[in-house]
């Protein structure tokens, strides 16, 4: 096999690969073996006609497509290895010469991983955000706990007041016509929560159970659905029931009921500690991101478009998976966010470019610094993940993870080591 390499443009090369006639003939035999049973030739049992007879009936090129495929599959990887080509995507194959008894010549045009020109990556100067726990944060958490522990009871007498929960049936109309998503039954609406369109909840105040009313509202200009943006709407509402929340008092009895503590002061201290820990994790995460961003800004890379698009594809698939867990699909998401695939892909591009660049930078630093993951470290990582799954048989689960995700775990460990090195060497500035 002979290979000539030509640089077409930055990050794109073309390989001209010449395969010996004997090797191509072997591929022809494989193609014949794969397809022989499909042919029904007069004078022969089906699938028993020899190659030369089949070619006589169907033409010399009858097996070329499969033979070409077999030949490329067996020679293209060797051509890449021989020329130290690291492809990003599948190649564009074009046949130059093909024929039995002749050399098989084809070209493979392929996008390759870009050159990464690292700048300063040790000792980068970065600001570190800090977050304090405020008293209002603790008070808000206590209010949330009160709401969760509140008792909901039917309001036997009286009309709807702010803070009450109205059980309603409603049907919405725009321009006199019903619209999708504008109808509900037995909907629990907390008055004052701001759940519905502006001025909807306020118009229910004073109604009694059994009352009906037409509520007039206007959708916001940027509501997110073209047919409703800025439109006047009328909702026919029937109040079926009114409920009240009985909010518990904030005292030691409340503390005992909602926690493992005996006093309200202990609950407050626990909230403070948990929020401080959460803030610390946030500070560390944001600092890591800032360090990596600084290192990336010092690095020159001309990222191939195909890498950005592939990452966007991954992001779309992740979005689709998350939506499925919520019982939604992409089309529904696009509709209710007033988007389409093109808009979403464009929105994701910036994040995609940053991620691709960050991955390339970390990989290059790992190569320069000779950062590796040992087999023992990979096993420990698999065990750590197995424990997080809460498996009854951690050892068995770790083996399953190791067998299926060894390369991913290896990459994860290397990335963590590189990030630790970058963070440890960085300098915090005011």
Swiss-Prot record:
It is an enzyme of class 5 (isomerase). It comes from the Bacteria. It is found in: Cytoplasm. It catalyses: [protein]-peptidylproline (omega=180) = [protein]-peptidylproline (omega=0). Pfam families: FKBP_C, Trigger_C, Trigger_N. The keyword Ribonucleoprotein does not apply. One of its GO terms (biological process) is cell division. GO terms for cellular component: cytoplasm. GO terms for molecular function: peptidyl-prolyl cis-trans isomerase activity; protein folding chaperone; ribosome binding. Residues 163-248 form the PPIase FKBP-type domain. Its EC number is 5.2.1.8. Keywords: Cell cycle, Cell division, Chaperone, Cytoplasm, Isomerase, Rotamase. Belongs to the FKBP-type PPIase family. Tig subfamily. PANTHER family: TRIGGER FACTOR CHAPERONE AND PEPTIDYL-PROLYL CIS/TRANS ISOMERASE, TRIGGER FACTOR-LIKE PROTEIN TIG, CHLOROPLASTIC. Consists of 3 domains; the N-terminus binds the ribosome, the middle domain has PPIase activity, while the C-terminus has intrinsic chaperone activity on its own. Involved in protein export. Acts as a chaperone by maintaining the newly synthesized protein in an open conformation. Functions as a peptidyl-prolyl cis-trans isomerase. This is Trigger factor. It comes from Clostridium kluyveri (strain ATCC 8527 / DSM 555 / NBRC 12016 / NCIMB 10680 / K1). The gene is tig.
């Amino acid at each position: 096999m002979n290979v000539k390499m030509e640089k077409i443009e930055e990050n794109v090369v073309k390989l001209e690969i010449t395969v010996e006639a004997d090797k191509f003939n072997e591929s022809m035999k494989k193609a014949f073996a794969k397809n022989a049973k499909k042919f029904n030739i007069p004078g022969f049992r089906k699938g028993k006609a020899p190659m030369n007879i089949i070619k006589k009936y169907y033409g010399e090129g009858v097996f070329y497509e499969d033979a070409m495929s077999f030949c490329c599959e067996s020679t293209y990887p060797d051509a890449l290895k021989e020329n130290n080509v690291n492809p990003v995507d599948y190649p564009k194959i074009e046949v130059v010469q093909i024929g039995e008894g002749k050399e098989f010549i084809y070209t493979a045009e392929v996008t390759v991983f870009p050159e990464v020109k690292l700048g300063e990556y040790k000792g980068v100067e970065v600001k570190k955000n800090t977050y304090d726990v405020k008293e209002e944060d603790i008070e808000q958490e206590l209010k949330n706990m009160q709401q969760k522990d509140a008792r909901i009871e039917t309001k036997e007498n009286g009309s709807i007041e702010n803070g009450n929960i109205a059980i309603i049936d409603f049907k919405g109309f725009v321009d006199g016509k019903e619209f999708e998503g504008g109808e509900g039954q037995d909907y629990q609406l907390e008055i004052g929560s701001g759940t519905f369109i502006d001025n909807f909840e306020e118009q229910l105040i004073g109604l009694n159970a059994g009352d009906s009313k037409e509520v007039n509202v206007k959708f916001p200009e940027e509501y997110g659905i073209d047919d409703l943006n800025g439109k006047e709407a009328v909702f026919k509402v029937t109040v079926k029931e009114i409920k009240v929340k009985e909010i518990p008092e904030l005292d030691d009895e409340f503390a005992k009921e909602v926690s493992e503590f005996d006093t309200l002061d202990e609950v407050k201290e626990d909230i403070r500690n948990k929020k401080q820990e959460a803030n610390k994790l946030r500070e560390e995460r944001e600092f890591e991101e800032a360090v990596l961003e600084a290192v990336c800004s010092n690095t020159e890379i001309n990222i191939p478009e195909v890498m950005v698009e592939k990452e966007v594809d991954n992001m779309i698939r992740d979005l689709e998976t998350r939506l499925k867990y919520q019982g939604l699909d992409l089309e529904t998401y696009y509709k209710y966010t007033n988007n389409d695939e093109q808009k979403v892909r464009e929105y994701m591009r910036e994040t995609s470019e940053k991620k691709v660049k960050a991955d390339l930078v970390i990989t290059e630093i790992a190569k320069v610094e000779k950062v590796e993951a040992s087999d023992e470290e990979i096993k420990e990582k698999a065990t750590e993940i197995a424990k997080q799954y809460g498996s009854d048989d951690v050892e068995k689960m770790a083996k399953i993870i190791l067998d299926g995700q060894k390369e991913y775990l290896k990459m994860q460990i290397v990335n963590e080591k590189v990030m630790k090195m970058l963070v440890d060497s960085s300098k915090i500035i005011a």
